[in-house]
């Protein structure tokens, strides 16, 4: 079984910034992760990430906020999306 795209949502906001979320189901867990999901969540402009969550092979679950990278404690896809959108709102000064 190859990776299957389980969720994809992309929005271009009024200021031209992009919020894009992709989650794939994998046949087995990726190196560095304890779950069978691969994900890439992005907020920013082309070429300029302000907030990002991903689990790049070998790095495991982590997030980027501005220029800071830190480990992320993945629990569920729903919580992942909730945490990401909360960081997006904070980055936009909305909360």
Task: Map each language-model feature to its residues.
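The feature represents the first ordered module of a protein
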Residues: 1-62
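Residues at secondary-structure transition points
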Residues: 64-66
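Short, compact, well-ordered microdomains
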Residues: 68-95
